[in-house]
């Protein structure tokens, strides 16, 4: 297969990536681009790629962070072998880093790279397993809302599993998960990697008021300040701030389309599954559904507020008693399993928060 080496720059760093044209016997099934982010976990990546392989998207963007040390190389090479088992007609772009950047800024870098080459794209991490309907769902709605500035992203993960009371296949919300999502270049081009809105007092005051009025996470602005001070772009806070500053809405499927299988001992963001509070464990065991097409589209673009209430309760935003209860539950579970290191870590974090010393890194 022909391969072309290209070079692209990110904030003064130059990285080589390749563009491969796969001409196999099976045709592409869905005309959409998919970005896959992975590192060194072949077992979970295999499950994600199996679904991508069934869906057969027309374009693939493959981003892999580089090794921290020699011990990472076995997993890194195993992951590369998995994602290169492509047996359908597909244009494949690869960006494999030579050094380790970590989740941040890798998330930001990979997505800016993919959206510089595609005007709309699906994003999947190596622990996010989609249903087959997810690809068709995203394709149809990426086209439908391509030029609608009110819509910021299309989500795949529904924290309700199935949202009651909605007579359509999706609805609109101002809260969302990044466990499987899609968006447009028009949105990514607005991402403010330098957090310049923090230099505008009126914008900061507006965001402060919105966070209070919506009972959003109270530490959001401090998180943005910490991320700016760290001098590297953090995708999640950049995405959320862009959505808030633009009064954007997300498309949410009425039925969940994603499984997250990332709650393992070696995961970056989550503690061991068995020591999670019960409600959070449920997020990792939800059923994913297949939709019936054609989709039933809502007539009006208006936020469905009951979902926001469910979402806030799931993450204990604006629910201090629920948060305290979960902290106690987590402490008891860690005691039960003898996870004293996690207990010390959690206590240290809470003490730092009480003293105003906690920083988001």
Task: Identify the residue ranges that each predicted region occupies.
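Peripheral/terminal regions associated with large enzymatic or DNA-binding modules
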Residues: 22-123, 128-361
């Amino acid at each position: 297969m022909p391969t072309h080496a290209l070079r692209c720059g990110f904030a003064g760093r130059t990285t080589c990536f390749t563009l491969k044209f796969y001409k196999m016997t099976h045709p592409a099934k869905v005309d959409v681009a998919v970005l896959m982010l992975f590192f060194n976990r072949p077992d979970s990546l295999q499950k994600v790629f199996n679904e991508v392989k069934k869906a057969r998207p027309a374009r693939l963007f493959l981003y892999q962070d580089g090794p921290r040390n020699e011990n990472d190389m076995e997993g890194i090479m195993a992951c590369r072998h998995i994602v290169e088992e492509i047996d359908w007609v597909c244009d494949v772009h690869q960006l494999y880093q030579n050094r380790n950047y970590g989740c941040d800024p890798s998330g930001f870098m990979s997505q800016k790279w993919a959206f510089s080459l595609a005007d709309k794209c699906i994003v999947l991490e190596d622990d996010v397993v989609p249903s087959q309907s997810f690809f068709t769902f995203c394709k149809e709605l990426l086209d439908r809302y391509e030029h609608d500035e009110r819509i910021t992203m299309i989500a795949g993960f529904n924290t309700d599993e199935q949202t009651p009371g909605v007579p359509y296949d999706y609805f609109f919300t101002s809260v969302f998960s990044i466990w499987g999502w899609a968006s447009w270049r028009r949105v990514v081009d607005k991402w403010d990697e330098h957090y310049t809105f923090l230099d505008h007092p009126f914008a900061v005051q507006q965001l402060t008021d919105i966070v209070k009025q919506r009972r959003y996470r109270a530490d959001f602005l401090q998180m943005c300040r910490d991320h700016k001070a760290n001098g590297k772009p953090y995708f999640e806070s950049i995405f959320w701030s862009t959505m808030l500053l633009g009064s954007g809405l997300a498309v949410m499927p009425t039925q969940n389309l994603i499984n997250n299988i990332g709650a393992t001992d070696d995961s970056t963001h989550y503690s061991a599954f068995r020591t999670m509070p019960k409600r959070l464990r449920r997020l990792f065991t939800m059923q994913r559904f297949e939709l019936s097409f054609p989709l039933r589209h809502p007539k009006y673009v208006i936020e469905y507020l009951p979902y926001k209430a469910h979402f806030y309760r799931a993450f204990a935003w604006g629910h201090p008693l629920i948060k305290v209860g979960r902290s106690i539950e987590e402490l008891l579970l860690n005691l039960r399993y003898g996870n004293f290191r996690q207990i010390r870590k959690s206590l240290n974090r809470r003490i730092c928060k009480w003293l105003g010393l906690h920083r988001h890194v």
